[in-house]
């Protein structure tokens, strides 16, 4: 049997560097790329010969070549096989096209791998590589997977990643040396290999150079050089907290938590699968942390995943988050449950699906408990599919068996689904709380009536029943109870005091609400005074910070009452206006002190203690009086102060004055005070010595040695600081320049940013010190100590824009202080920008001044604008009729806007052009006593005669009337009368001889007939030969001298005699009388015209239905229309029957006239 032994085929793949520039590195994309290596006959020429590379192998003769030997040992015979083949490795797509190799076209040199082997004559070696920066920006990861046709196995492969990360950013760096690359071992598994490269956060924007070395089955491969920027290939972590909910609008809201660790904004890609009546898959990219999916459908399921990426498009998409599934029911209620209180409002939304069909919101009806249909006025249509119902002023839910909620159903017009929403409405009962004082002498009970519904006319009262011992298991309202007087306090609570009390007796209490409709009792509660004790607070409370241990020690003494075991609670905090309290529990009843760990040992703490029964019954006592700690040293200072120096003297001389400056230690560093500072000096020749500077924060000494080291110590009452800062002054180190550049940019008057670059050196940089001051001023220098790895720093100070500042940056090494970089003023670009922005400071004041000027102009022209747009309201005091009126009295305005208090004279009213005739007759006596008229009568003819019936129709009422007298005549009238335009006439008749008869008769109320027939009336005969026949005839009666209202009683015979009087009026023996006028109105205003005015200002209207019906005039309140002994003269010159006059009446007379007099309107 022959055994064959295979020797390992060794492939050495050497990388050829073109030493032209660093741009030979291949810039990889921030996503997946592929590495192809293969013999010439496996791919086309484009794969084997990159752009700019020659196709023949003779161009590579100058390169060093590795020999691959395949050795077979068969039966102890060594058989070597040699063949030479040139292999190329490049990056490209899966088909091997557009394969890139790095060449230098100017010199014709190619970066390639030269390989001699016959084992890869037919197959190439290909890998799939992906690189990214981890989301927390701490680790750079490259993942490599072999393609399916790769002949090597991962488990037999060893992969190393070699990388170089420069120290500084430079546009034209030198080519990297091979020895400068660092090696990282990659972890390989069956699926692939993964390499981890740690990248400092400060170098994320630097160019990272790297390449891969792969060893498998004894064969080594080396990839081309790759270049990338870690910040551009960041792969964030998948979003967390993915959840979904249905909004009030019926949309599905997908939300997730934002990644707060990412230093840049992110975009998110949401992938969801909707499975409802149709299957829909969508992916959307958003910048917010939520996404609304329109029109959520009932009976659907949504599977959602989210991933993130940098918002600017660079970087790598994160992995998808874990899928979340959200399923909706056939009927969707949102929200499905509501818990609310009495009197509030609540709304439900619903989407109804029936047999794979969405019901329109217009067809949805709502039911409560499937027994009460909710009125449609409470419905609202949110969208075509979403319906809303609103409950206003909710009442308490009535329990139905075990159901303590109302079931709200969203139904179709034909049927309801079994799913429902739940509505909980809670009514809070009246809570009675009682507490017994610390001396165990009285019990105070409090309760609030706010939970009682507003009930008009109700009263509240506390009633109680005392049981001899303890409380019953279930307290109930006792039939014999006593009321307790309670007093309403300012806080709205009622307070009742029970004194004396029985500690072990049970007091059952309840609130009774008394109302006229009945009384209501709140649920009773039983109180045991011994179980509601509020103890007295602990006394003699002390607090202190212990020395060396640094603990807050609190001690107290327990109260005398009660005698039960007590637990204690301590609260403590930093003393100030707003104390942030912390609490500590002490359950040991015998304990009288406690020690607490505090963070600030040098602060003043305020401490209080309270107690309660250990078994939990009763209340906490009030807090004790506060106790305060004293600030004292508890430990030696934690460290010495940070310090810096200021140099004086000539820099060329060997002796210079050095002034040390340091900042006082804080309490937390000094623990808790500093009594003095000590400066230690160390030199090579003079040894070591110390100086005590007391509480000063500076010290000046003479620097004469080549190297002088100083240390500043802080000393308190317990000793000196253990950790201190050293500063070495060295002449050789003062010439070391480590700062290449320094720039200062003003951001505002209170902030300046400094940026710098450092040059590499052989010294160990400890930290940097920034100095700044006003240029050409020795005083006012300020300084800051910053870490050595910082490249820029924000200085916050009060910078004066017109001043020039000097900025200095000192590198501090272990060996001493290096040479500073000093700049005078800000960087030129920043100054130009400020000068360009100076125009803004000029434009803004101009705009503000213009606005102020415009506002002033508007205020000055306010009166003109007011007259232009609004009419000027006249001042009543400038009117003649308002002279002498006091507008401060309310009565003035009452008379002013209702009726004038005095007569207002108008000119004569112009009559319409119509024929006028008048006749005045005065009769002194009646023919017989029975026919006498007990009052003066004035006839006013206002109607038109009916040519057919020869009658006069006065009113719409057709009733016959008897004129009281010796004779009576039956009068008939027509129902309707045709009225024609006419002029009003009046006849004035006075009889002073009938006064006594009038007084004897008294007040007679006998209405005159509403209609007078011309066929039986003696008036027609009396007026047959006069001008009255041509006009309409109506009678108007006025009382004569009677203090009361008189309705005359007439007969036609007496009226006939009255009209036959043609005598003269006597003028002597009569005093002047006032006259009452009749108003004349247009015939077109017959229904509402004014007919009668008087001296007292009576303005009356005469409706047709009231003509000759109960006509009265108040004689003593208005002017006498006809006096008893009226004398107008025989000629009648002095009597003017028509003088239209509009006058006013007093308020009192006006009211009487309105109440007791009929309107006189035709």
Swiss-Prot record:
Cytoplasmic compartment ranges equal 861-1162
Q: Which InterPro entries match?
A: FN3_dom, FN3_sf, Hematopoietin_rcpt_Gp130_CS, Hempt_rcpt_S_F1_CS, Ig-like_dom, Ig-like_fold, IgC2-like_lig-bd, LEP-R_IGD
Subcellular localization is given as:
Cell membrane; Basolateral cell membrane
Gene behind the chain: Lepr
GO MF annotations, alphabetized: leptin receptor activity; peptide hormone binding; transmembrane signaling receptor activity
Q: Which GO terms describe its biological process?
A: angiogenesis; bone growth; cell surface receptor signaling pathway via STAT; cholesterol metabolic process; energy homeostasis; glial cell proliferation; gluconeogenesis; glucose homeostasis
* Residues with the Phosphotyrosine modification: 985, 1077, 1138
Q: Where is this motif: Box 1 motif?
A: 869-877
Q: What is the recorded phenotype of mutating residue 985 to L?
A: No change in EPO-induced JAK2 activation and EPO-induced tyrosine phosphorylation. No phosphorylation. No phosphorylation. No change in STAT3 activation. No PTPN11 binding. No SOCS3 binding nor inhibition of signaling
Provide the species name.
Mus musculus
Q: What does this protein do?
A: Receptor for hormone LEP/leptin. On ligand binding, mediates LEP central and peripheral effects through the activation of different signaling pathways such as JAK2/STAT3 and MAPK cascade/FOS. In the hypothalamus, LEP acts as an appetite-regulating factor that induces a decrease in food intake and an increase in energy consumption by inducing anorexinogenic factors and suppressing orexigenic neuropeptides, also regulates bone mass and secretion of hypothalamo-pituitary-adrenal hormones.
Q: Which residues form the signal peptide?
A: 1-21
Task: Tell me which residues make up the Fibronectin type-III domain.
Answer: 238-331, 537-632, 637-729, 738-832
Family under the similarity heading? Belongs to the type I cytokine receptor family. Type 2 subfamily.
Q: What is the effect of changing residue 651 to I?
A: In strain: NZO
Q: What is this protein called?
A: Leptin receptor
Keywords assigned:
Cell membrane, Disulfide bond, Glycoprotein, Immunoglobulin domain, Membrane, Obesity, Phosphoprotein, Receptor, Repeat, Secreted, Signal, Transmembrane, Transmembrane helix
The record's comment about this protein's domains reads: The WSXWS motif appears to be necessary for proper protein folding and thereby efficient intracellular transport and cell-surface receptor binding.
